């Protein structure tokens, strides 16, 4: 079983997550940016299908882990998806940071656009969880993903309301 940390730095986002996940086990809501969370071994990125990680939380991920991570994500997308990763797919990649070794890239949109009213957040989140499940099936105990930080997928550029993101 993995532990989910929902990073909700906007108070309205944190409140919406608290309502939606009030009775959920293994889910913690942190009302701060992910960079303030000390213990996690995997971060989820909801960047776009081309691996551009230069806006909203993805810009913070790139600043936190370094530009090498975006380059490696894009190279993986070139190799495995011929340059364009479909929404609803996800993969696990090493970050290069021993304290936070994994990133899941799970795009919520092909290119920056409003995705409110679509099932893109659901599909990307489900794909991220499946990628973690698949990773853990084959990983040795010391390389399993145990604690995952999940941002408010689609809430930034995608303009999905916080309550909808939580559902």
Placement of each model-derived feature along the sequence:
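Macrodomain-like recognition of ADP-ribose-binding/processing modules
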Residues: 1-167
């Amino acid at each position: 079983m993995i532990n989910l940390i929902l990073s909700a730095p906007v108070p309205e986002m944190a409140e919406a997550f608290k309502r939606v996940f009030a009775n959920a086990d293994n889910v913690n809501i942190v009302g701060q940016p992910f960079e303030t969370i000390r213990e996690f071994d995997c971060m989820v990125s909801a960047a776009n299908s081309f691996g551009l990680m230069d806006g909203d939380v993805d810009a913070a991920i790139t600043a936190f882990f370094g530009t090498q991570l975006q380059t490696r994500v894009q190279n993986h997308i070139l190799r495995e998806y011929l340059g364009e990763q479909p929404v609803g797919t996800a993969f696990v990649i090493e970050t290069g940071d021993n304290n936070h070794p994994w990133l899941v890239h799970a795009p919520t949109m092909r290119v920056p656009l409003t995705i409110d009213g679509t099932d893109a957040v659901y599909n990307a989140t489900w794909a991220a969880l499946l990628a973690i499940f698949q990773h853990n099936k084959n990983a040795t105990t010391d390389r399993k993903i145990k604690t995952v930080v999940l941002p408010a997928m689609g809430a930034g550029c995608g303009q999905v309301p916080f309550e909808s993101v939580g559902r």
